[in-house]
Amino acid sequence: SNTPARFNSDKRLLYGVSGSAGKVAVFAVRVNTYPKPNKSKVFYIGTNYPDNFTQIRKDILVNFKNLPRLGDYMHKDCYEAAKKYSKDSFIVIEKLGTKFLPTLFEIKRKVDLLSKYFKFLPNKFSDHLMQFLSKFYPNHLPKRMENFKDKYDHLWIIEMVDDGIEEAKVYFEQYFKNNEGDFFMCTENESKKAMLHRYVSAGAFGRYQSLKNKTNNESFSMDIALPRNEVNWFENLPDEIESSIELKLYYGHLFCHVMHQNYIVKKG
């Protein structure tokens, strides 16, 4: 189909409750709509050619009897940025859980307020402090993930459940016999770290901007809902535009074809 599978901020749909942010509170009951799986497995996939992921996506959506539960894409540059600039967030969530995040944000807010009384401290001092402290913590990412990042530009986390695990394993083994790239099946620890790394990657953009605010200019983010049948999903910018970009981070959801693309423009 040449229509998107998912829309973000589609103004045509922002009516009623959806168009009343800050005005209407909605309470709902969450119920299970699918049977709870007995087991799950995360597949970590890498390639240097986006066309390989295009073909894998098509094969899975068209031919698989069991569809994935999750499929998150991350470009190598985004992986690197998240590893460096979201490391402290990763560690806090891994050790203390997401429930601690409101407390952490409150601590950061108070530190930033106090730091304004000291002219020699940089703006958003809490970000500078947490970034500095994170350097003393050892590498938090599994070796196999690191090896894939070194070998491949494009990374894809796919979670399968129950019968879909064997179906995906057989498919990937066969596919990568004849195509560039590779995959591995994550251990439980690798699965948690892969998903958490992808989760905190969104924060790397803001952290980088806070630390480098003297060297960069404008920043902007785009959520792009691609048509279901779009094959050229990975953006390649013209040289004249690429040369003006200081940082760009690409990540997204390949199965529903939504890409999150963040850019920071060079000063001047």
Task: Report the location of each language-model feature.
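Noncatalytic alpha-helical scaffold of FAD-dependent oxidoreductases
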Residues: 1-268
